[in-house]
């Protein structure tokens, strides 16, 4: 097993991203509460682990209960598709994305719930069971490409533009900002839930937060939202990546304040973390 590598990431932006303020995220939270399938997922205390580590408490947010999708991804996709339909009613309700994990299934599920269709592109090496899970959703198509994840993202974006469809991708880049930001705002519903649940357990605020990262939309959303809530009392936040696809780590390591990609065809045990390019709008 490789040793764990840790690097300190300085905040290089003078101002917090305004789209992640509690006020600007509130519409996403309210939308989720309006869904008939919505309920907060459990925040599970781990007292034995806390005793072993010598800390007051350890909590884990169990997203396996979210919308029956076994992942938090539905939070971002439902809100982004809802907003896309509301703001662009003239567009054909077909939603396109690239996925190497749960994101594509969540897009297909959300599109079907809202009366649309989904076209999902998957990188080479995608597990057949993941392809089948998407095909099982009404009005959803899944196609495996001979490309890595980052190449599949660009292919899906181009496909959506050529056909007049809507790309629902959490990877943001120049010229594609609004949808990824809606997705990131959707993820903050989980953070808001967790903070309220901690208080019910008698913990007023977290001292440390651990989040995983692929392109960094989820990690950036959690971090940005907490930064707005706590200001100078922001908890210590640790972002955990798979070593073959550690694009955030590499970006910090380069030290120039810019996002940097992992090239080639990285492979990770958890498919959803096999992402080589940071989301421009949640970096750093």
List the predicted regions and their residue ranges.
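PLP-dependent amino-acid enzyme catalytic core
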Residues: 1-284
């Amino acid at each position: 097993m490789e040793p764990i590598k840790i690097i300190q990431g300085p905040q290089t932006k003078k101002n917090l991203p305004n789209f992640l303020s509690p006020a600007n995220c509130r519409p996403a939270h309210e939308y989720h509460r309006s869904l008939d399938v919505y309920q907060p997922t459990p925040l599970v205390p781990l007292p034995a682990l806390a005793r072993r580590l010598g800390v007051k408490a350890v909590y884990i947010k169990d997203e396996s209960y979210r919308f029956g999708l076994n992942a938090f991804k539905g939070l971002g996709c439902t809100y982004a598709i809802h907003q896309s339909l509301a703001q662009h009613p003239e567009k054909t309700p077909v939603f396109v994305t690239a996925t190497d994990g749960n994101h594509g299934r969540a897009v297909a599920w959300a599109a079907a719930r809202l009366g649309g269709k989904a076209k999902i592109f998957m990188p080479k090496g995608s597990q057949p069971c993941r392809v089948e899970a998407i095909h099982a959703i009404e009005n959803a198509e899944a196609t495996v490409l001979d490309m890595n994840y980052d190449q599949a993202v660009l292919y899906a974006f181009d496909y959506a533009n050529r056909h007049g469809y809507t790309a629902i991708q959490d990877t943001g880049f120049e010229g594609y900002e609004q949808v990824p930001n809606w997705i990131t705002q959707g993820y903050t519903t989980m953070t808001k839930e967790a903070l309220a649940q901690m208080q019910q357990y008698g913990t007023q605020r977290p001292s440390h937060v651990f989040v995983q990262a692929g392109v960094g939309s989820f990690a950036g959303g959690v971090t940005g939202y907490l930064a707005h809530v706590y200001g100078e009392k922001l908890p210590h936040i640790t972002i955990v990546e798979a070593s073959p696809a550690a694009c955030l780590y590499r970006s910090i390591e380069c030290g120039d304040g810019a996002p940097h990609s992992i090239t080639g065809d990285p492979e990770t045990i958890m498919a959803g973390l096999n992402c080589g390019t940071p989301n421009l709008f949640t970096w750093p």
